[in-house]
């Protein structure tokens, strides 16, 4: 193969050979991240929770996605893990490493989100948010980062939220956990900066996903929400967030670490 052909192949499949674990990937942003990675040459392990998908009316979504991914990347797999269970984060990374032969890129997309008035917040709600949105990530990072550092290359991208800097009054605990998570990402970005490992957060604003499908039941109300959400007066789509994730995971993102990058149509302005 000529050098020019090799360069062209790299441009078309910049993630060829990369082994990627994506949490919360059966729907929405995580789903599009998985699709784009496979389209650009990676092998992926998608994490999902069968129980949660069934509870929210999306039973079988992960199986459909895995089938689609395997058409391009036969070694790609789906991993059903409840991140609410103790030590599940480390177990997930271990299973992904066994399936893929290692994890080069970790995309933390899974989260729980409960809307509630501040006065109605319970200890159970706080514990659930903390467990899924923070503790599980600590476990995953403890398992994933040492091999990345030893290899001299790795990428961690966390899906944050506009709420971590502009919190919704009904998402107080969720927003606090997202802010804490980015603080963790910044801390570890500094620790591993000399190891060839970068860690960043991508913070979406209003994105049209299954999580907010209930808002689109009344299209007039939805369009009003879009107009007020950001200076672009529209919701983003999962692909727009996923594209930023892939940039950060690529060699082109090698000099970016510890950043919180908004993908929000200018809502942070």
Predicted features, each with a name:
Residues 100, 234-263, 268:
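C-terminal substrate-recognition "lid" of short-chain dehydrogenase/reductases
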Residues 141, 177:
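Active-site helix of classical SDR
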Residues 19, 26-27:
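Conserved glycine-rich cofactor-binding loop
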Residues 117-130, 222, 226:
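Substrate-binding pocket helix/loop in short-chain dehydrogenase/reductase
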Residues 193, 198, 256-258:
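Short, small/polar-rich loop/turn modules that mediate ligand/substrate recognition or access, typified
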Residues 54-60, 194, 201, 206-230:
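A glycine/serine/threonine-rich, flexible loop-to-helix segment
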């Amino acid at each position: 193969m000529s050098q020019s052909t090799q360069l062209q192949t790299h441009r078309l499949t910049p993630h060829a050979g990369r082994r990627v674990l994506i949490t919360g990937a059966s729907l929405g942003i995580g789903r599009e991240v998985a699709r784009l990675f496979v389209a650009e040459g990676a092998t992926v392990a998608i994490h999902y929770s069968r129980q949660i998908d069934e509870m929210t009316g999306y039973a079988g979504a992960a199986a459909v996605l895995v089938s689609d991914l395997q058409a391009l990347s036969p070694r790609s797999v789906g991993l059903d893990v409840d991140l609410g269970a103790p030590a599940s984060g480390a177990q997930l990374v271990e299973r992904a490493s066994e399936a893929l032969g290692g994890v080069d890129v970790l995309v933390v997309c899974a989260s729980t989100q409960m809307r509630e008035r501040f006065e109605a917040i319970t200890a159970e709600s706080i514990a659930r948010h903390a467990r899924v949105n923070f503790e599980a990530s600590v476990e995953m990072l403890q398992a994933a980062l040492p091999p990345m550092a030893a290899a001299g290359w790795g990428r961690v991208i966390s899906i944050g939220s506009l709420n971590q800097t502009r919190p919704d009054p009904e998402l107080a605990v969720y927003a606090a956990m997202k802010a804490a998570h980015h603080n963790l990402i910044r801390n570890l970005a500094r620790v591993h900066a000399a190891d060839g490992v970068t860690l960043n957060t991508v913070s979406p604003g209003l994105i049209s996903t299954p999580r907010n499908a209930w808002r689109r039941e009344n299209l007039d109300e939805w369009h009003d929400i879009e107009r007020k959400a950001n200076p672009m007066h529209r919701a983003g789509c999962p692909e727009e967030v996923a594209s930023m994730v892939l940039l950060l995971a690529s060699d082109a993102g090698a000099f970016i670490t510890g950043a919180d990058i908004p993908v929000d149509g200018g809502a942070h302005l």
